[in-house]
Amino acid sequence: QKKDKKDRFYGLM
């Protein structure tokens, strides 16, 4: 399961 750009973006929030 790879993380998408959005996934990483939300991870920062």
Curated annotation (Swiss-Prot):
This protein's name: Tachykinin-like peptide-XIII
Family classification: Belongs to the tachykinin family.
Organism of this sequence: Phoneutria nigriventer
Positions of post-translational Methionine amide modification: 13
Domain of life: Eukaryota
The UniProt record lists the keyword Secreted: yes
Tissues with expression: Expressed by the venom gland.
The keyword Secreted is annotated on this UniProt entry: yes
Subcellular localization, as worded in the UniProt entry: Secreted
Modified residues (Pyrrolidone carboxylic acid): 1
GO cellular component term, pick one: extracellular region
Cross-referenced InterPro entries: Tachy_Neuro_lke_CS (IPR013055)
Keywords: Amidation, Pyrrolidone carboxylic acid, Secreted
